[in-house]
Structure formats: structure tokens, C-alpha cells
Amino acid sequence: MQTCYQLVWLAAERSPDRPAMVDDISDRQFTYAQLIAEVEMVAAGLAERGIGRGTRVATALPPLFDHAVLLLALQRLGAVPALLNFRLTAGDIAALIADGGIEAAVLLPDEDLAAEVSAALADDAMILTMSADRSEGTSFGDCRSDAGALGPLPELAREDPAFVFYTSGTTGLPKGVVLSQRTTEHRILWLSTQAGLPHGSHLRTLGFVPLSHAIGFYGVFLVTLAMNGTYFVQSAFNPVTANEMVEELGITYMFAVPQLYFAIVSAPNYAPEKMRSLQLVLYGGAEIVPPLLQRMDAEWGGVVRHIYGTTETMCSLYNPDPVGRHRRLRPGFYSRTRVIELDGGPDDVVAAGEEGELIVDAGSDTVFSEYLNRPEVTAEKLRDGWYYTGDICLLHDDGDVDLIGRSDDMIRSGGEHIHPSEVEPVLISHAGVTDAAVIGISDAKWGQMVVACVVAGDAGSSADQLDAHLRASGLAGFKRPKAYMFFDALPRNAAGKVLRRDLHGAAEAARDGNSETEFEAI
């Protein structure tokens, strides 16, 4: 078993003089040997501050150069990083720290945040601050000491906690996902196998996805270093700058959610020739719209692949050639999955041509151990040796599946099951729509009424126009919304995901006449 630190240490043993990390803010760049030396000094400084094996240390930071160094230093000590989304409110960050038994924290320099976090920690807990430019008033820069004082690597067991990542929190406060030491190398092995990354690929990677996201940490940062590549930090995502960095640095590999790729191709300085150095582009974490996928495939260098996973599983399914079948997925290397009846058990497998819930063998070494201090939720999601993803899939004869959407979002109207992912892309294809979400609200006649929540673009749109558009598209009549609401923007959480619970409340209030937002029934 190789830990996160050991994977990078081995890379340094193989190629000590290769460039490992390059910062976009300062002039710092480390070879692999220099990176390990820096990590050892930071680890020694942390040890002097009481951090050691098993210490839970929260980080709430962008994808900074020093954030990456910090995570490796914590792993050198056998400490457990708890990676929080830095875009969460100070109150949410403090609540998660208190709930998770966190013992120390490293944060952006913000007095209000520090005060809230300090109140959630023990009186003598370590709190360090970090910034992109290492400005005065930040304390992480002083966290260095003599690496010679460090002892040998701690002896860690397979089931010892390695990391705590957090879900996106679309239904409440994010849940802490505990990942054991065994998962680290297996997540890297799975990704490299399914993505087609042979050992020694020497990737040149643009790192703009936050390390608190499984894609950003495993899929971008760690896989790059494990493969002796170079990780170019973009400490704050900017699509204009990203275009320039891809071209100027000769970036060969990117992995991100589709929304960030859309921002790149929509930037005013975008040109296909800027992307010619790319050899491999992976996407995951959200559904991609076919026009964007087709554009990336046609205009960017290399190949585009879809990697499906969750924070809990990282990777389970993939599609090596998603163009033309963007929802199609197949089980990956040593993945065991089933599609079962909704509310069914592991043996209630659906027939080919039917939809059901995707479950993943929890015995896989990529799968999480538990939700932090949430035994009831753990028992609900880990049952009979399987992880219940909550994702709805259509099973094909050959074992492939089509990813339909979340079971939590399923609308049950008039005895039919309707998933928002069947309706939303058709709405967004209208020239007068820039964003849309489809929900179901309680209704005496239908059980649930389908309601479209729409953000209109400059061209404008009306409920009647959109209904006519859906009729012309061939969408089944029972799937068409029975009411429309128009918003300036849809509510989203810190991870950028639509807060459907907020839309439910807004729609029910508008329907009942308790809102200024118009509820336009069709």
C-alpha cells in the first residue's frame, strides 16, 4: 500500500530533477527533489505545533501552491486533511469543523472566518492562514522547521483514515466522506487505467480545480505527480488566463467539470489553436451538453473522455468516446456495479431496457469507509456490501448504462416517472433560455406538477413560447412542464449545483399567491 506522500516520494526517487510544481503567483517552482524537501520542512513545522498521526486538520483554501504542499506535509505525518470548500460561508465552515471533531485548521486570511472557526475549535488549537501571494499577516509561511527532527514514516494500516472530503451539500450541510489509506493508490490506478495514462506520461497539467474536489485532488494534482508530470497552479480560475496558460505552457492534460470548459470556450480570447497541445481531456462531476462536447472534440487536441464517479467512489464508470452518446457509460477496471429497481435490494436487478438505481460494490478499494459522524446516513447508503449512489441509469444489453440523473430529483406525475435531465436540455436549447431547472411540486390532481424554473436570455422567452418549443421537440406530453417561473438567476450552492429545495419553496409559494414571482400555468 502506497500513501499519498509515498506516491510522490517515489516519483521524486525516479526523477528528482524533473519539474514537479510551478506557481502562477510567485516565481516558485520545485523539482521533485525540492518538493519533497519543502514538504519535509513543513511537516516538521506542523509536528512542532502538535500535528501528528490521526490529527484532523481542516483546510478551506483555493488550489494554491502552498495548499498542495500542506496536504503532502500532513500526509507525511499521517494526519488527516479535511478538505472544505473555501466558498462555503464562515458559518458553514465552522459548523462542519465542530461537527467533524476537527483539531486544527488552515484558512484564508479573513478575520470573520478566523473568529468563527476559533470558536468551533479547542482553545489551544492550531489555526494557520495562507494566501496566494504569501502576504504579511499570514502564518503558514513560518511553518517550517528542521526536517532532520522528523522521525520515520508512521506505520499506517489500510483502514486508517487518510482524508475527509465533503459532498456538495445540495440537500443540506455537506457530509464528510471518510477515505481510508487503501483508497489513494487505487483511485490513481483506476484513473490512469481508464483514462489511458501509462506510467511516465509526464503530464503537463493545468491545476485550477480546487483540491477540496475529488477531481481537483486525485484527478488533477495527485495523478500528475504520481506520473512524474508537472502541475501548473492556477490559484484562481479565470477562463481568459486559462486559455493563455494552455497555449503558453503547452498543457497536455486537463480534468474538470463541464461548466469550466464552457467558460474557457466562451472567453473572449478563446481560439481553437490555443488548445492544440492538449492530448487528453477528461470531464465529470456534472452532465455535459452535447454541443459543448462536440466542440471540444472538434477543436481541441487529443481525446475527450467522460469519467463518472462520486466523492464516495471517485471512479466507477467511464466512456472513452462520449461524442454522440454523452450519457453512455461502462464499468471500469475492477469495478462491479448493478442497476436495481428503485427502493430494491442488490438482487433486484432490472432487465435490459429498464431504468433503476446504480449501486457500486462497496468492497472496491476505491470506495469510502463512512460518513463522518453520520452513522444513520452511512447505514442508509452502505447496505448489504453495496453503495447506493442515488443515480438513475438505463441498462443496456451489453452491460453499458445511460446516466439519467439523481433519484432525489425524480418527479412522479400522473403515475409516470419524469427526470429533470430529460426536459432541461430541451429547454436550454431554446435561444431565449440561458439556464433552467425542472422540479416537481405537490399537486392534488397529478401527485406532483412539473414546473420549469427558467432564466431568460437577452432574446427573451415566454411560457407559451417555451411550451411550443417543447411540443415541437417531440418531448412526450406528460413530461412537459405544466407551469413556468422566470428568475434572474437560479439558486446554487458553493459547488455551483442548483438548490432545488429552494426552487420547490419558491414555486409552492408562488402557486399559493405568497410570492411576487409569477407562477404561469399552461
Protein language model features and the residues they cover:
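Structural core segment of the AMP-binding/adenylate-forming
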Residues: L7, E48-R49, L72, R76-C143, ...
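Conserved AMP-binding/adenylation subdomain of ANL enzymes
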Residues: E185-R204, S212-T252, A267
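AMP-binding/adenylate-forming catalytic core of the ANL superfamily
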Residues: L88, L107, S364, S369-E370, ...
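AMP-binding/adenylate-forming catalytic domain of the ANL superfamily
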Residues: L475-K497, E516-I522
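Conserved AMP-binding/adenylate-forming core of the ANL superfamily
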Residues: A20-L64, A68-L72, T89-A94
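Conserved ATP/PPi-binding loop(s) of AMP-dependent carboxylate-activating enzymes
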Residues: G345-E380, I418
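Gly/Ser/Thr-rich phosphate-binding loop
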Residues: I251-A256, A267-H326, R336, D347
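Conserved adenylate-forming
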Residues: L46-I51, T55, A149-E159, V164-G207, ...
